[in-house]
UniProtKB/Swiss-Prot annotation:
It comes from the Bacteria. This is Glycerol-3-phosphate dehydrogenase [NAD(P)+]. It comes from Levilactobacillus brevis (strain ATCC 367 / BCRC 12310 / CIP 105137 / JCM 1170 / LMG 11437 / NCIMB 947 / NCTC 947) (Lactobacillus brevis). Its main location: cytoplasm. The keyword NAD applies. The lineage of its organism: Bacteria, Bacillati, Bacillota, Bacilli, Lactobacillales.
Length: 337
């Protein structure tokens, strides 16, 4: 099966997923809004700002013109930052209408839209009419782009309300080192993918403050409980959160310096000012906006999320990190489950 696939977003994850698809023999068009990045990808076959020491195949072609990238596509993979996905989807919708196309839609972005607090599949469904798309599938799981670039073993989930769409995405991506499972719980997979970045911020902060493994394990375990509570309030399957998009994604994101959210938390824990961390990170720190979204959703739905609330207070209200930790530890005793 060789498909025409447009990959929208040429950051670290988008460009490496494009490389996996290209390696599988698909006709891949990698789109970026940055003409200089497109030129580098097409002439030097590198993407040095995002992926160091990696050379892309010459068969992978980058585009700065969105309509050209979408010509006659069978599938579109969105890997743009959360804040840009609605705008890009709106542009895509116009082009699909003009070209009378109805491709498969996939997204591998991890976040919740600000203001609306909607999942990204909901945003895509709102912006792209049903007559110009198939069912939306989410590709997510414990996956650092750097590891996939080295062809380290990686397992992810393709989640969709349509079993056929999930299996289609599974077939697109499967390689000897990149294994894809299917899951019908698109709600749980998206919520797990987004909210684990909050826990990664906290884990990085604990490291920066000098806390040990016990504290980090406690954070990840109780953080996962919070994610599960919020997810199930939306109808997610609790089993999803002990799978690749729950436990798996938390482990890889909250224990590794490859995670930009972990690195941001680490710097905050070491006393860096938030604005300075944002300015020199050089890439989007999705966990910052997701913290606000999750905090607001928890209050709206009456879901207890004390860790998320503490991280929100540190980021948005300027609360001292050590005070926030102390307040968490001094909460009234209760049953674990």
């Amino acid at each position: 099966m060789s498909e025409k696939i447009a990959v929208l977003g040429a950051g670290s994850w988008g460009s490496i997923l494009a490389s996996v698809l290209d390696e599988n023999g698909h006709d891949v068009r990698l789109w970026s809004y940055n003409p200089k990045q497109v030129e580098e990808l097409n002439t030097q076959h590198t993407n040095t700002h995002y992926i160091k020491d990696f050379t892309f195949s010459p068969s992978l072609v980058a585009y700065s013109d969105l309509a050209s990238a979408l010509t006659d596509v069978d599938a579109i993979l969105f890997v743009v930052p959360t804040k840009a996905i609605r705008s890009v989807a709106g542009q895509v919708a116009t082009i699909l209408q003009d070209q009378h196309l109805q491709p498969q839609l996939i997204h591998a972005s991890k976040g919740i839209e600000q203001q609306t607090y909607k999942r990204l599949s909901q945003v895509l469904e709102e912006e792209i009419p049903a007559e110009n798309r198939q069912a939306v599938t989410v590709l997510s799981g414990p996956s650092h782009a750097e590891d996939v670039a080295r062809k380290d073993i990686t397992l992810v989930t393709a989640a969709s309300a349509s079993p056929e769409a999930a299996k289609y995405v599974q077939k697109l991506f499967m390689t000897s080192y990149f294994r894809v499972y299917t899951n019908p719980d698109i709600i749980g997979v998206e919520i797990g993918a987004a909210l684990k970045n909050i826990i990664a911020l906290g884990a990085g902060a604990l490291h920066g403050l000098g806390y040990g493994d016990n504290a980090k394990a406690a954070l990840m375990t109780r953080g996962l409980a919070e994610i599960s509570r919020l997810g199930t309030s939306f109808g997610a399957d609790p089993m999803t959160f002990i799978g690749l998009s729950g436990v798996g994604d938390i482990i890889v994101t909250a224990t590794s310096s490859n995670s930009r959210n972990w690195r941001a938390g680490d710097e905050l824990g070491r006393g860096e000012a938030l604005d300075d961390v944002i300015n020199h990170m050089g890439m989007v720190i999705e966990g910052l906006a997701t913290t606000k979204a999750a905090y607001e959703l928890s209050r709206e739905r009456g879901v207890s999320m004390p860790i998320t609330e503490a991280i929100y207070q540190v980021i948005y209200e300027g609360k001292d990190i050590r005070t926030a930790i102390s307040d968490l530890m001094q909460r009234e005793g209760r049953s674990e489950f």
